[in-house]
């Protein structure tokens, strides 16, 4: 899991970008 991918996933799930 890449850090950038993890950040993108977190953004999608929490709706906090």
Curated annotation (Swiss-Prot):
Intrachain S-S bonds: 11-17
Subcellular location field: Secreted
Domain of life: Eukaryota
Keywords assigned by UniProt, alphabetized: Amphibian defense peptide, Antibiotic, Antimicrobial, Disulfide bond, Secreted
Record-level GO cellular component terms: extracellular region
GO biological process annotation, one example: defense response to bacterium
Tissue: Expressed by the skin glands.
Function noted in UniProt: Antimicrobial peptide.
Record-stated family: Belongs to the frog skin active peptide (FSAP) family. Brevinin subfamily.
Protein name: Brevinin-1AVa
The species this protein was found in: Rana arvalis (Moor frog)
């Amino acid at each position: 899991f890449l850090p950038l991918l993890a950040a993108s996933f977190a953004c999608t799930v929490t709706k906090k970008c």
